[in-house]
Amino acid sequence: MGKSNSKLKPEVVEELTRKTYFTEKEVQQWYKGFIKDCPSGQLDATGFQKIYKQFFPFGDPTKFATFVFNVFDENKDGRIEFSEFIQALSVTSRGTLDEKLRWAFKLYDLDNDGYITRNEMLDIVDAIYQMVGNTVELPEEENTPEKRVDRIFAMMDKNSDGKLTLQEFQEGSKADPSIVQALSLYDGLV
């Protein structure tokens, strides 16, 4: 197992370099770290949650990590292979603002129907609040997930149909400096 998994085949490296914002050397370095942490070459939801717990020790990141895991797991087989990992990492850490917003939209669109409903956003925002715990002091108008979602929908849901399209989400996010800043701070954390 050890030697055969320690390096990616050149054609795989080339393909991942084409599909990501990483150089060949970076892809190899990420692969080395991935295999060190995941000797089987795959990461399951439990392992993914453990990683998030290291970053958010004062809250409970379990629910949020599960949502992120589901976006990373492109083929929906319950495991993240290296190619899925590196492509998601590329978008979240080095992608354009539009790429990051499309990725975030997939995160919020829990049932993959092309819309973000108020309940879907509430699930994600609630998970974020659980994850950060009491480490972040929130303004009065956003101190509950419900208040935050109400504020977001008031700003983004232009046609007041109770759901956000990708376009509404992108335009609304770009109009809110705190969202743009959050996406930038998030670089590489995912």
Swiss-Prot record:
CDD domains: EFh (cd00051). SUPFAM superfamilies: EF-hand. It is a peripheral membrane protein; Lipid-anchor. It is found in: Golgi apparatus; Postsynaptic density; Cytoplasm, Perinuclear region; Cytoplasm. Ca(2+) 2 binds at residues 109, 111, 113, 115, 120. Transmembrane segments: none annotated. PROSITE patterns: EF_HAND_1, EF_HAND_2. GO terms for molecular function: calcium ion binding; calcium sensitive guanylate cyclase activator activity; voltage-gated calcium channel activity. Coiled coil: none annotated. Residues 24-59, 60-95, 96-131, 144-179 form the EF-hand domain. Brain. Pfam families: EF-hand_1 (PF00036), EF-hand_7 (PF13499). Keywords: Calcium, Cell membrane, Cytoplasm, Golgi apparatus, Lipoprotein, Membrane, Metal-binding, Myristate, Repeat, Synapse. Its main location: Golgi. GO terms for biological process: regulation of neuron projection development; regulation of signal transduction. Ca(2+) 3 binds at residues 157, 159, 161, 163, 168. SMART domains: EFh. A lipid is attached at residue 2 (N-myristoyl glycine). Belongs to the recoverin family. Neuronal calcium sensor, regulator of G protein-coupled receptor phosphorylation in a calcium dependent manner. Directly regulates GRK1 (RHOK), but not GRK2 to GRK5. Can substitute for calmodulin. Binds 3 calcium ions via the second, third and fourth EF-hand. This is Neuronal calcium sensor 1.
